[in-house]
């Protein structure tokens, strides 16, 4: 599979609103400007998503502006006890009013509504995530403050065109950020503490013009292998990926490009409903990513409102297997916490 690397800084879009150079990079070399988009403005989708995980519990925060609707989301997941709570307030016709930054490297993001607020502060060498929501769950309110540090020098960046003219997805995934902070939930102030020694975060930064109907597979993990920070991003399912895949390993702050990775979910692809809680496997065309996956918790969600539908299975669990770096070094991965998902959207 071809893997074209973008190595020069240039505008993401040309005068027509199409990608100037499809492919991948290890930093935000393509320059995104919302004003360069030359498509139906209601098809623009922008989001910042953070997930912090230590294998015992996880916190996920989203601020999204999908033009015809905005979505803010807070998820608390107890992986040891097997429960999760997700609340996702929506707003109508945000149309860029959320003012998500045109780069992940600078700018704060804030969104608030009735009885909640979410703030992502970008302080350069660290990021501070603050979220609060009254009546978050049956036990009461939630307050979270988490600081992310040790931001790696390299990340997964990809510019993917759709076959439809002027449609594209520009995406960055920053793995392996160290996380420190707490989540307090409920009347009894139950506290979940993220220790930077074993707690890591990923940022999913996405900007694009999407088609109406699509499916994606995405997997992400961050943790330690032999005492060193290691993680990966894997995924596929939408757009024209002939220029590059989004599959990448991260080790000691550096990115190592993979070719094609396939998700093997029990029952997926047939007429039967996939069994997301049975063990999965992952294979690669170049033999550099071979994993077994043990699910722990399926954060399942299905919303169907008229023409808008989203069927999501974000499955948290642990990865075991082997990964091979660019120089041939083999890393043996044991009980690495992460998640893998299949999402079907009509949006």
Predicted regions and their residues:
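Structured soluble/peripheral alpha/beta segments that form catalytic or ligand/cofactor-binding pockets
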Residues: 1-347
